Each structure stands twice: as C-alpha cells, then as structure tokens.
C-alpha cells in the first residue's frame, strides 16, 4: 500500500505536531435540541469538558448496553466467517493484575474490530484453576482449595466485568470442575492406549522435614525448601511421563507452516532441537536372567543399529540411583573417572541383539542424554571405547564406488542406502512400539506427575496381578475426593483418602489401588482451546464438526514467557488429536501475539530489600530510604507484591476511567514491548487530550448542524472544496493503515496515533466545511467507528449524539444503530484508483519553500514536475511573474530547485 503510506505521510507529520502543541478545544455547555439517545437525554446538555466525572457518567451509562450488544448472537451472525480469538486464561489468584488488564484489553479491542468487520467472533474466557498456588493458599487459610478457588473466580469475574471486557461467557470453562477434567482424563487414557503415557523412575525435589515433593519453584536459590527451610534432597520416585519426543520431528517440520509465528518459531525450534535420531528400547538382563525392566537409549544413526557394540549410560542415570533391580550390579562395576564395563546386558527389542551396558567416565553425554547407543561404524568415539574394552562389533556400512553409503549385515535393510534404511528402520520400530520416533538429543519427555492434591487425578489403577490399568472410559471422571485437612506434608495427599484409593481392578476385579499422583496443570491448559469450541458437550471432549469449524485459533494472545513450554504442550496435544481423527487441523494456532510485560518502578536497598513508596524520600536529586538515607537502586521490573511496584487495576480505573486506561495501555507501547507504567509520561496526557478532542469535534459538528442552517455542499468555494478533498484523502489513508495494523502487525499504538492525526486534521476545518461538507461528516463518522474498539464507551456516547443531527449527508452508515454495530469503514474505490504520490520538495535559490504532491510515475520527469509546480498553489504564490533562469531535478531525492532572478 505504497500510495497509502505516501499520501498519509503528507498529512500526518505536521498534524501530529499540531496535536501535541495545540491545547484542547473546550466548549461551553450548550443545549442540543432533540438529544434523546445519550446520557444527557433528560437535559440535552453537553458539558464544556470531557472531565473525569463525565467519563464516569458515560461509562456507567453505556456499560450494560455495550455488554448486552456484545452478547447478542443472531441467526444471521452464525452465517458469517469465523474468527476465533483466544487470550490465555488466568489462574484464579483472587485479584487481577495489570498484566491481565493488558492482555484482555488487547483481545477485547481486536474482538470488537473483527465483529465490526463482519466476522462471527468467539473471544472465550475460562479459569486455569488447578495447581499448587491454590493448594498452598488454602492450607494457609485453613480452607478447602475448591472453596478458595471458586470464591476467587467469582471475584475476578466481577473485576473483568467492571473493566468493560466483553467475553463469550456462554463458553466459560473451569479446569477444576469434573465436567472439564473428565475429558483431561479421557485424553490421558487415549495417550496411554497409544503408548505415549508411561511410568518410570525420575529425580524429584524431596523435603526431608515435610516428607513431601517440591516443585522447582519451591526450592530457593540456596537449595532449601521454601517452607521448612530444610536442605532439599534429590530422590527417585516412580513418575508418569508423556512421550512428547514421539512428535518432535512432526512438530519441528510443522513450524515451516506457521509463517505468522514471528519470533516464536525460533524459540520452539530451539526447544525441540535438531531431529536427526531416535530412541530405541532395550530389555535388561543380569546373569542371563531377564529382569523385566526396560532401558531407552538414543542414537543419531539408527540405520546402523546392527553394528551396535554397547549401550552407554552416564554415572547419574536412574538405573544407578533408583530402585532398579540392576542397581547393585551397576554400582559394583562403577569406578569413578573410568569407562566401566558392567555385567548388565541390554537386549534390543527391535533386533534382539544383546550388548553390555557401559558406565561412561564423562558424566555429560551429548545434548541432555543420560543413555546412548554405541555404534562404532558411525562414531570414532564409539570405536575407541569398543576397542578399549574389547567389545565385539560389526562394520555395517559400505561405501559404493560412486560414494553412496549402503548397509551390510543388517537383515532386511541390507543393501539399502543409509537414508532409505533410516526411514524403514525407524518406521518398523514405531510399528513394534519399541521407539523409532525421530527426535533430538536434547528434548525430554514430559513429566506430568505431581504429588499434590489440587490437580486432575491420573485415571490409572495399580493391580498386583495386571499392573497399571486405565480406568474404563465409561467410569470417568475419577472424581477428586474431598480431604478434610491438607497439610502440604507427607507425600501425596490422595494417599490418605483410603476409601478412594482402595478399589477393584477394572480388568481382573481383584483388589487394587488408584494412582495417587495428580497431573501437571500444563495438561489442563494443553487442550482448553478445543473445549471452548464445544464447552457443553457431555459425550466427548469436543465435537469434531465444531472443532473443525472454529479451529485453528485465528489469533492467540498471551505472555512471551509461555512461548516455549505451554505452546509446545498445546501443539503436542493438537498433533495427537489430529492423529486420533478427532480434528482435521494439526496445528492449533494460526497467529500469535506475545505481549510484553507491564513493569513498575522498583526501589531497592543495597541489601536487596524493596521499599514501598511511602518509605522513600524523593525530595533530593535521587531517591533515598526515608529512615536510613541509604541510596536506592531504581529499576523497572515486572510488577509484584514483593517488590511493592504494582498498581491496583480497580484503583487506577477509578482514578482515570475505563476508556482512558484502555487507551493508555494500547498507546504506551507496541503490544510486544514492555510498558513502563508511569502516568506522568506523555502517553496518559495524550490519550486524555485525544478523548477531549473527540468530544469537542463531535460537539462542534452537532452545534453546526443544529444551528438551523441546512447543509448545502454546493455553497463551498474552491478552496473549501480542496480542504474537504484533503480530508477525504486523509480519511482513506487512515482507514487503510488502521485496518492493516488491526489485521497484520497488531500495532495498536500506531492505530491510536493515526486516529489522533485524523482528529487533528478535522479540528483544522473551517466552520463552513464542518457545516456543508459531506467529506467532513464522513471522516468524523469513520473516526468514531474506528475508535470504537479502542474506547467503546465514549465513542458510543458521541455516536449517539451524531444520530441526532438532521439532514445527514452520508447514507452509508446505519444511523439507527449504535457505533459498535456499525460496519468497519472501507477505503473508497476512487482512492485506490488514484496514482501513487510522492512529496516533492520545492527549493527557490537553494532555499526550501515547501512541498507539493506529485504522481510517482512522473517524479523523475523534470519538464512535467516543473509544470506541476507552476500550476500548484505554492508555485503560483512564489513563482508567478518571476524570471526562472534554470530548474534542477534531483536524481536521488524528491527535490526540485528553481534558480530565479532576484
């Protein structure tokens, strides 16, 4: 849209300067005849200023009406194209913070825009309600986590409503309710049946005093428990994992189909790593006896598996430290600092080859591996080790005369090229469920076990005879039992609910016990976007038809801190559901908007303690501690209670109004950048002035059109018509730019700037242009409609005022409907047909005298540019009657210099 940008720049720059320098226009109170559709319907008065009280009155009046408008869905709406807008749902902590306000202001603004564009929009809201914080908060208050959570949800729902945010509340979900976690359990069982959910021993953080497992977040920087203060120990426990590595290659490859994931694709790709190898499974033997245990090891060259010599493990491997039956044999063979051959044998479940396990001297294997398959044919290091330990092996790769490498001594893969054998062998391993999923050497499977109460119960029954058995689907949900007293100590709380734990095996009907771990809350949020498409379904997690209609999410908004883990798990579940034939789309999110933080000013003592503002002396050149006079380190950091740098959203809204805070958040920085919260900066005064200008412009228009004079466009003189034409061009340029920002880069700060510029241009119009010009009326209407998603309350009031004006000149607006129900403005076809323009600088005797617009296709034609300058208003004023000696047109810049007789 080169022409748009060029035409827009002609008007925006000087008008921006005028906007900053000019004081706001203030009108005295005046009676407006026939005013019947605004908050001033009783008196018909418009106040002289858009004061805080006026803002509050406007917002109070329009709040409920706007909410009702947003919630109405007609049969006609259901025929419109879909737009699925999703903002990351919050953990119900009990109180919204400014980060919530920012993300939900962004989603609300874009949702309103898309509705005005004629889209069928869902903008759902729910609650990520399980998790450790709720459990700990409930323990501290001697409450049950459920009552604490539900109370918080109720309060935060009211807060969202008071902020004027319009969500699709009919789609609300809460992850801690059985009607949701039933389907989380269902998906877990589907993963288990597909061989993608399994148990193995893994290291956990263990508090020896409280006798409980700690999350990483509960271990401080000194390695001590946040609660007891005890030194945290590492302990092996049997844990549940989801085999995310099985989808590593598919997810890595699918990133190429996500061009809109700016900045995030690289983070996802780095997290997954280079998918060049796979894991393969082995059974373990000691003294010729099968132990029944399994070992998984990685190789970057699975095609050469028939040349295996050993399986290497690191000294930190779980087999050496957990409860494995081979632990003693391995420890007996271990000599620290040396590569140690052990009596434990690994039997390939793919080829049935039997090789020894070697404990490596180096604790760090490649990537994040703790086990690796040794294949001398493809690794000089493996060759060195095999020869040093006297391990037999076969060379299985032969080079052809043409340089092609082929396999030998490799069963049915013999004669294949390495590339073909890689594909065939990994496919066979996957079919046998003994590994073969192409992945990297750094990606690990997802540990989902949590030894806590407040989470989704894992739907597995442990039977002495049958082993782990999934709960039958018809018996879901496995309801989280009520536990009278939670202490946060003593291991998994569910283990104390004996009536719940003790059960019958679904398979053999013998005595069994339920799994007492709960799921990581990331599992709940890994599929919630599906549930929003069909939130009341009682027969399945979601209906395929509805999911196929709404998915993928058109725009997903949330913090950049979730760009790796949450997005990875969500993508994994989506890929899995696709392979289960539950949905036709593999990727869940089309576009991402990772918004920045809102940071507050932090004042820190040399000791590291953060001070409240009331404990700081600001009278000197630099802030100091009021009590000790110590100098303070001043930084901008993420808002938090502990840093005393936060602001209460409700307090700040009460002080400035909803629309003002919305505009400040949108205008202060691009969405992806951090906002340094400081209401003394230009951003807040700027949006306050702009609202006043919108108010003044509308009032001026109403006054002109209700003065008793009928508008007659033919009465405008040529100069006034030119001004009106300029407004028409400016309006079209702004529509094009604003629409692009809303749909492409989401630079809503630029949207506000563009609309400020259009407001300033309108304020320069003469009274006759305001009265008689259809271009002025159209530009003002377009301005209010485009501002409506940003500031819905004030624009609703101003639009209600516009509808009172008699003898309207524009018939393409729905005058009997509110501003939020207007169609989004479009660029006039005549504007698109106009030639691209450049701003040609005009110099006279080397002195800059101004600029004129010149069609781009003639900008390098000196004769035509010369003629256009002479015909322009600027040329007639400065060159008419003067003797022009010569003119020079710059070949590099848009500049023409006239040398004239003095």
From Swiss-Prot:
Listed GO CC annotations: mitochondrial matrix; mitochondrion
Cystine pairings recorded for this chain: none
Reactions the enzyme catalyzes: tRNA(Leu) + L-leucine + ATP = L-leucyl-tRNA(Leu) + AMP + diphosphate
Segments carrying motif 'HIGH' region: 91-101
Residue positions of motif 'KMSKS' region: 638-642
Record EC number: 6.1.1.4
One Gene Ontology MF term: leucine-tRNA ligase activity
Family label: Belongs to the class-I aminoacyl-tRNA synthetase family.
Protein name: Probable leucine--tRNA ligase, mitochondrial
Native source species: Mus musculus (Mouse)
Encoding gene per record: Lars2
